A protein has these predicted regions:
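Formylglycine-dependent sulfatase
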Residues: 5, 20-193
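N-terminal hydrophobic targeting signals that begin at the initiator methionine
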Residues: 1-2
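Bacterial N-terminal signal peptides
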Residues: 5-16
Length: 193
C-alpha cells in the first residue's frame, strides 16, 4: 500500500509540473481576415457585433500599428509566415492561384517552425494562398502548361496522390486549408504530422 501511495504522489506531482509548464506558455491565436478593416470589429467601434473577437481582444494582446508593402493575399501571408518582406520571394507582384507551386522554401525558418522549436503545436485553417505541390495526372503537366496556374481548372490533378509543399512542409503540425479563393482548385486539404 505505501508503494501505491508513493506512485500516486509521483504521478500527481508529474501532472502538476506538466500543467504548470503548460500554463507558463500563453496560447497564440493569429487571425488574418482578408478585407477586414481595423474598425470593423465591435471592440474597435464597428457596427457588426463580434462578441467572441471582442473577448479575445480584451483578454489578449492586440497589435494596432501594422504596415504592409502589399495588402493582397499571397504577399501578406508570405510576410507573416516567413517574417520577410514579400519582395524577397520569387513572386514580385500579384497573388498565387490554386494550382501554383509552393512559394515558401521548405528549408526556410518560418513562424510555425520557430513556435515548434519553443514547444508549441501549430496549425493553420482557411485560405492558404502560398502554393501547393500537386501531383498531376498523365498529360496534366501539358494541360497546365497550356492554361497556366491562373486558368488551370483542376482536371489535371491526381487527387489520389499526396499533396506536398504545403503547411506541413513549412512547420505546421496540422492544417485544414483551401489552396486559394479563386478559380480552381476549391478542394480542401487536411493534413497532420
Amino acid at each position: 500500500m505505501p508503494c501505491l501511495k508513493l506512485l500516486f504522489l509521483f504521478v500527481f506531482s508529474l501532472f502538476c509540473l506538466t500543467a504548470a509548464n503548460a500554463a507558463d506558455k500563453p496560447n497564440v491565436i493569429f487571425i488574418l481576415a482578408d478585407d477586414l478593416g481595423y474598425g470593423d470589429l465591435s471592440h474597435a467601434g464597428g457596427k457588426a457585433r463580434t462578441p467572441h473577437c471582442d473577448r479575445l481582444a480584451r483578454q489578449g494582446m492586440r497589435f494596432t500599428d501594422a504596415h504592409t508593402t502589399s495588402s493582397v493575399c499571397t504577399p501578406t501571408r508570405y510576410g507573416i509566415v516567413t517574417g520577410r518582406y514579400n519582395w524577397r520571394s520569387t513572386l514580385k507582384k500579384g497573388v498565387l492561384w490554386g494550382l501554383s507551386e509552393p512559394l515558401v522554401a521548405a528549408d526556410r525558418l518560418t513562424t510555425p517552425k520557430f513556435l515548434q522549436q519553443n514547444g508549441y503545436r501549430t496549425g493553420v485553417v482557411g485560405k492558404w494562398h502560398l502554393g501547393l505541390g500537386w501531383q498531376m495526372l498523365p498529360n496534366g503537366e501539358k494541360r497546365l502548361a497550356k492554361t497556366g496556374p491562373t486558368k488551370g481548372d483542376g482536371w489535371q490533378i491526381d487527387y489520389g496522390k499526396k499533396v506536398t509543399g504545403g503547411p506541413l512542409a513549412i512547420g505546421f503540425d496540422e492544417s485544414f486549408i483551401i489552396p486559394a479563393a479563386h478559380p480552381p482548385s476549391y478542394d480542401t486539404a487536411r493534413s497532420r504530422s
